[in-house]
Curated annotation (Swiss-Prot):
Subunit (UniProt): Influenza RNA polymerase is composed of three subunits: PB1, PB2 and PA. Interacts (via N-terminus) with PB1 (via C-terminus). Interacts with nucleoprotein NP (via N-terminus). Interacts (via N-terminus) with host MAVS (via N-terminus); this interaction inhibits host innate immune response.
GO CC, alphabetical: host cell mitochondrion; host cell nucleus; virion component
Similarity comment: family membership: Belongs to the influenza viruses PB2 family.
Protein name: Polymerase basic protein 2
UniProt keyword annotations, A-Z: Cap snatching, Eukaryotic host gene expression shutoff by virus, Eukaryotic host transcription shutoff by virus, Host gene expression shutoff by virus, Host mitochondrion, Host nucleus, Host-virus interaction, Inhibition of host innate immune response by virus, Inhibition of host MAVS by virus, Inhibition of host RLR pathway by virus, Inhibition of host RNA polymerase II by virus, mRNA capping, mRNA processing, Viral immunoevasion, Viral transcription, Virion
Any GO BP: DNA-templated transcription
SUPFAM superfamilies the UniProt entry points to: PB2 C-terminal domain-like
Biological source species: Influenza A virus (strain A/Chicken/Hong Kong/FY150/2001 H5N1 genotype D)
Subcellular location: Virion; Host nucleus; Host mitochondrion
GO molecular function: RNA binding
Function: Plays an essential role in transcription initiation and cap-stealing mechanism, in which cellular capped pre-mRNAs are used to generate primers for viral transcription. Binds the cap of the target pre-RNA which is subsequently cleaved after 10-13 nucleotides by PA. Plays a role in the initiation of the viral genome replication and modulates the activity of the ribonucleoprotein (RNP) complex. In addition, participates in the inhibition of type I interferon induction through interaction with the host mitochondrial antiviral signaling protein MAVS.
Chain ranges for the short sequence motif Nuclear localization signal as given in the UniProt record: 400-403
């Protein structure tokens, strides 16, 4: 597509220089929880058909498409100044500025977009500015499909990948579209938009970073737990905790980290003080370079939804809420997964059953290698010894019995 620079004025009368993509184009947008087909002309959204798992995912896809369309009513919907920066403190380019702005709050964007009456089409419904479904009216040009979007795309599909700089490339690596003209030296890493890569968690803003970080910990809890007790430094340095740091107020990062690491060390030292939920909750804070200080905290602040919200060191909060009855974690009201082990019950019952057939010889003995999880014990041969991590974070040395006790 032909690109030319245009100066546009936001609703706050700030001048933005954007590169306008001219001519008709069709895109297939694929996120992890929503897909969409966008047809657009120069600075105009012609049609957006979106399908997604829930209201939030659909809203996120609509915001991306509206920004991508470069329509004037989107630019005029900006309230306040755009001054988002990346981690190196450089201003983001205008298209990213707009994206971040509306990902934080899209109310004005949706209100100003305009609505239109819709025809009744099988499998399609309308969506109103407050993101509720409707069969009579819809945001201009926008429709929600209940069945997915594949059948609405035209036949010739170009397979493209979108990297974390919002550059669109074809299979040969040619840049088809980008927010800035790209010199090829900028690297050609290829990240499609599934958010399994932690580098991409940020694209959907702070809430996505928060939820994705905790989901990652829960999904990998078995290995995280072992690293937590055996090799915490390696765990703290994992890149999955990188995006989270941008949510923690700069001045507090080092203090929080020092505080949490000390707390964790006490848990490791004092038998029986291992608390799964608390470890999961505080772990991302331990990733920053720690400052040694005597500071104690009862709550830690994260910047989401445009303001600081608190995570309580002990107990639940709207940001991080663990439900003992359902064993599920919700982060900012979104489900972040289930804990397979029960953190509070002291998993003694399960473990004594699992450890039947093993003799507990005493405390951990480093000569027998790193601690195994309960699940890995089944691989031991009779008479073989191993360290094993039992529920409350204690590591003990066991030996598989030579003969099965009946």
């Amino acid at each position: 597509s032909v690109k030319k620079e245009e100066e546009v004025l936001t609703g706050n009368l700030q001048t933005l220089k954007i590169r306008v993509h001219e001519g008709y184009e069709e895109f297939t947008m694929v996120g992890r929880r929503a897909t969409a087909i966008l047809r657009k002309a120069t600075r105009r959204l012609i049609q957006l058909i979106v399908s997604g798992r829930d209201e939030q995912s659909i809203a996120e896809a609509i915001i991306v498409a509206m920004v991508f369309s470069q329509e004037d009513c989107m630019i005029k919907a900006v309230r306040g100044d755009l001054n988002f920066v990346n981690r190196a403190n450089q201003r983001l380019n205008p298209m990213h500025q707009l994206l971040r702005h509306f990902q934080k709050d899209a109310k004005v964007l949706f209100q100003n977009w305009g609505i239109e009456p819709i025809d009744n089409v099988m499998g399609m419904i309308g969506i109103l500015p407050d993101m509720t479904p409707s069969t009579e009216m819809s945001l201009r040009g926008v429709r929600v499909s209940k069945m997915g979007v594949d059948e609405y795309s035209s036949t010739e599909r170009v397979v493209v990948s979108i990297d974390r700089f919002l550059r669109v490339r074809d299979q040969r690596g040619n840049v088809l579209l980008s927010p800035e003209e790209v010199s090829e030296t900028q690297g050609t890493e290829k990240l499609t938009i599934t958010y399994s890569s932690s580098m991409m968690w940020e694209i959907n803003g702070p809430e996505s970073v928060l939820v994705n970080t905790y989901q990652w910990i829960i999904r990998n809890w078995e290995t995280v737990k072992i690293q937590w007790s055996q090799d915490p430094t390696m765990l703290y340095n994992k890149m999955e905790f990188e995006p989270f740091q941008s949510l923690v107020p700069k001045a507090a990062r080092g203090q929080y980290s020092g505080f949490v690491r000390t707390l964790f060390q006490q848990m490791r030292d004092v038998l029986g003080t291992f608390d799964t939920v608390q470890i999961i909750k505080l772990l991302p804070f331990a990733a920053a370079p720690p400052e040694q200080s005597r500071m104690q905290f009862s709550s830690l602040t994260v910047n989401v939804r445009g303001s600081g919200m608190r995570i309580l060191v002990r107990g639940n909060s709207p940001v991080f809420n663990y439900n003992k009855a359902t064993k599920r974690l919700t982060v900012l009201g979104k489900d972040a997964g289930a804990l397979t082990e029960d953190p509070d019950e002291g998993t003694a019952g399960v473990e004594s059953a699992v450890l039947r057939g093993f003799l507990i010889l005493g405390k951990e003995d480093k000569r027998y290698g790193p601690a195994l999880s309960i699940n890995e014990l089944s691989n031991l041969a009779k008479g073989e010894k191993a360290n094993v991590l039992i529920g409350q974070g204690d590591v003990v040395l066991v030996m598989k019995r030579k003969r099965d006790s009946s």
